Amino acid sequence: MSSDSTPATGSVKRQKTTGLAKGPGVPGVAKVDPILVVDGVERHFGGLTAVNVEHLEIPRGAITALIGPNGAGKTTLFNLLCGFDKPSSGSWAYDGKNLAGIPAFKVARMGQVRTFQLTKALSLLTVLENMKLGSPDQPGERFWASLIPAIWRKPEAEIEQKARELLKLFKLDSKEKDFAAALSGGQRKLLEMARALMSDPNLVMLDEPMAGVNPALTQSLLDHILGLKDRGMTVLFVEHDMHMVRHIADWVVVMAEGRVVAEGPPETVMEDQAVVDAYLGAHQDVDLGEVTGRIGVVSPTEAIRVREKIESAAEAELEEEEKP
């Protein structure tokens, strides 16, 4: 893998990672070093197929964007991969470990964490308390250990120190004593991202991190997402903001109607006809009458002949009207 320059974010010039795939950017292409591998994952709701992913690999150490129109199955796939939902069939592996049937909290402890489009901060806890909840394997969570302060006091202090360091990194340190309910939408997004790092993950999955964010905080969120990669983490995020995707993503996966229809570097994917079809429809430049079957599909020559016939008839009608 190699890196190419990408436009600067803030005051820091970032590098885009290239050479992630073993072949051309087609759906299901093998990656040089995948951290997440999906095989034959399907999710049905009655007669509706929400997800049908034959094969997908997420490259390690890169930022991958998962895009597609509303209802494409992106969040459903996220829920399946994180253990929040169960697939109808298929398997997937994180870092070589099969995750099928493993509950969400165990998936997170293994190093694969996620955030949500609608933030899950506990409103009646302070920002610092929310952060401390993100730390796994706390001695004080075990009943007998919680009765002996000598067991949990030192780990508790270490957890609090780590939480404060992350809050400072995300510029939320001045809010540590505030209730989470008092934060703005963008600040809650930052809190969720910071809390996810309390478990020292290898793969961070962000579900629409820019949704509902004040424009003033957009740049800060972009910087922090790029910062995850700088810290050696892999990022997989769902997003509708194509400018953001083009700006920070190393690799893009496009879903439509539950399937992966395209993948590759952002500059290539944005020009893929399958992507245009997914967002605008496969018949965006075809007469609606032809699409619905109200009129037949005609050749260009036939179309010209019909147009000339109509024009001739119109001219004849005008001449007839002009006669005294």
Describe the residue ranges of each PLM region:
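N-terminal acidic, proline/glycine-rich, low-complexity intrinsically disordered segments
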Residues: 1-12
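Glycine-rich phosphate-binding loops of nucleotide-dependent enzymes
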Residues: 10-324
